[in-house]
Amino acid sequence: MEARSKLLDGTTASRRWTRKLVLLLPPLLLFLLRTESLQGLESDERFRTRENECHFYAGGQVYPGEASRVSVADHSLHLSKAKISKPAPYWEGTAVINGEFKELKLTDYRGKYLVFFFYPLDFTFVCPTEIIAFGDRIEEFKSINTEVVACSVDSQFTHLAWINTPRRQGGLGPIRIPLLSDLNHQISKDYGVYLEDSGHTLRGLFIIDDKGVLRQITLNDLPVGRSVDETLRLVQAFQYTDKHGEVCPAGWKPGSETIIPDPAGKLKYFDKLN
C-alpha cells in the first residue's frame, strides 16, 4: 500500500512537471524564433549596407585628403535621364558669355555638336585647368562644327568673379567658352552627376550630336581632369561614322583605317592589320 502511494505521488509529480513544461514551451519557442528573426534582420541590414555602397571615391570631396565612401543614395547616377543614343536631357539657364549674363539653352546648339561638361566648383584646383584648356582650344572645336559649354552649381555672379580673377591667382581670366549656372542643381541631377552629400557634381562630360542625341558620356572622380585631345578625337570619330557609316576601331584618329560593319567588309580591315 505504501509503495502504491509513493508510485501515485511520483506519477502526480511527473504530471505536474509535464504540465509546467507544456506551459513553458510556447514562450521558449517564441523567444527562439524572435532571436533567429533578429539575427536575420541584422544580416539583411549588413547586406543592404554593402549593396548600397558605391565604389570608393579616391578624392572624396573637392579637397584632397577628404576621401569617404559614398553610398548610392548620395549621388544621382542611378536617376540620370542621360541615356546614350537618346535625346540629351533639355536644359536652359543663365550663363556668362564674354563677360555678360545671357540666357542659354540646349536647343541653341541644334545643328552642331556640343561638348557639355560639368565641373565641381569655381575657385578650386583642377577645374580652372580644364576650363582654360578647353577655352584655349575652342577654335579646334569650332572648325569641326562643335561648341563647348561648361557648367557648375555656382551662380552666374560667382562665375563672373572667377573670370575676373587673374589666372596667376587661380582665376580664369578672359575665357572663350560659356559658363552655365545650375544653381538649383536640376541640370546636374538630370545628367546624373550631382553628389547630394557634397552639394556639387562629379566631372561629367557629354558629347551631344547635331540632332540633339547623346553620343558619349565620361565621368571622372574628382581629383583627375579630362583630356581635350581625347574629347576632340571622340567628336571626330562620331562625325566620321555619321558621314561614312563605317565604324572606328580602338585609338582611331582622322586618316586612320576604319571598319565596314558587315561580316565580309570587316575582313578588309583585319587583313591589312595582320
UniProtKB/Swiss-Prot annotation:
Q: What cellular-component terms does GO give this entry? A: cytoplasm; cytosol; endoplasmic reticulum; mitochondrion
- Protein's UniProt keywords contain Oxidoreductase: yes
Q: GO MF terms on file?
A: identical protein binding; molecular sequestering activity; thioredoxin-dependent peroxiredoxin activity
Q: What class of enzyme is it?
A: oxidoreductase
Whether Oxidoreductase counts among this entry's keywords is yes
Q: Which residues form the Thioredoxin domain?
A: 82-240
- What is the superkingdom listed in this entry's lineage? Eukaryota
The active-site annotation reads: 127
Q: What is its EC number?
A: 1.11.1.24
Keywords from UniProt, A to Z, are: Antioxidant, Cytoplasm, Disulfide bond, Endoplasmic reticulum, Oxidoreductase, Peroxidase, Redox-active center, Signal
**What happens to this protein after translation, modification-wise?**
The enzyme can be inactivated by further oxidation of the cysteine sulfenic acid (C(P)-SOH) to sulphinic acid (C(P)-SO2H) and sulphonic acid (C(P)-SO3H) instead of its condensation to a disulfide bond.
Q: What does this protein do?
A: Thiol-specific peroxidase that catalyzes the reduction of hydrogen peroxide and organic hydroperoxides to water and alcohols, respectively. Plays a role in cell protection against oxidative stress by detoxifying peroxides and as sensor of hydrogen peroxide-mediated signaling events. Regulates the activation of NF-kappa-B in the cytosol by a modulation of I-kappa-B-alpha phosphorylation.
Other comments on record: The active site is a conserved redox-active cysteine residue, the peroxidatic cysteine (C(P)), which makes the nucleophilic attack on the peroxide substrate. The peroxide oxidizes the C(P)-SH to cysteine sulfenic acid (C(P)-SOH), which then reacts with another cysteine residue, the resolving cysteine (C(R)), to form a disulfide bridge. The disulfide is subsequently reduced by an appropriate electron donor to complete the catalytic cycle. In this typical 2-Cys peroxiredoxin, C(R) is provided by the other dimeric subunit to form an intersubunit disulfide.
* Protein name per UniProt: Peroxiredoxin-4
Q: What is the source species?
A: Mus musculus
